[in-house]
A protein has these predicted regions:
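A short, flexible beta-alpha/helix-coil linker loop
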Residues: 36-37, 135-139
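Conserved N-terminal beta1-alpha1 strand-loop-helix module at the mouth
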Residues: 1-80, 88-92, 99-107, 117-127, ...
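Short gly/ser/thr-rich secondary-structure transition/capping motifs
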Residues: 110-114
């Protein structure tokens, strides 16, 4: 299992310091939540931050796109190492994951707490990682949804 620290709670002015803390702690990955204010209610970082971070760090940049129609924006995140899209955010999940792979990146898919694992069956051959949301996405301070643990167990058995 890999535990990846997230930048979501970072103030934009503290990003550089938080990256340093992550490196000093010995972590190799950095999770960057991208939110559009439409798929989820909040807004956050964009592709420019990912490009700027890639120039300044050798951390693996794991970008989580919580945006509608991610297939229209994947190119903006070409400097990420891993790009994860939500199953619920696109009608073209297979094409979206192929687009990520064509950039030479690892492809991930996220599922919301209410989405069953079997919804991913057709794309398992393209997926390098699955992100099981254990909270409703897009809001800070959400309560952990215990029933999502069953999905993690189910995925480990596949």
């Amino acid at each position: 299992m890999i535990i990846v620290p997230s930048l979501l709670n970072s103030n934009i002015y503290d990003v550089q310091e938080n990256v340093k803390i992550t490196k000093d702690a010995g972590d190799n990955y950095l999770h960057i939540d991208v939110m559009d204010g439409s798929f989820v209610p909040m807004q956050s970082f964009g592709g420019k931050l990912v490009t700027d971070l890639k120039k300044k760090t050798n951390l693996v940049l794991d970008v989580h796109l919580m945006i509608n129609n991610p297939e229209l924006h994947i190119e903006e995140y070409r400097d990420a190492d891993i790009i994860t899209v939500h199953q619920e955010s696109t009608k073209q999940l297979y094409n979206c994951l192929n687009q990520i792979k064509k950039l030479g990146k690892k492809a991930g898919v996220a599922i919301n707490p209410g989405t069953p694992v079997h919804m991913l069956t057709d794309v398992f051959d393209l997926v390098d990682q699955v992100l099981v949301m254990t909270v409703n996405p897009g809001m800070l301070g959400e309560s952990f949804i215990k029933s999502t643990l069953k999905k993690i167990v189910e995925l480990k058995q596949i």
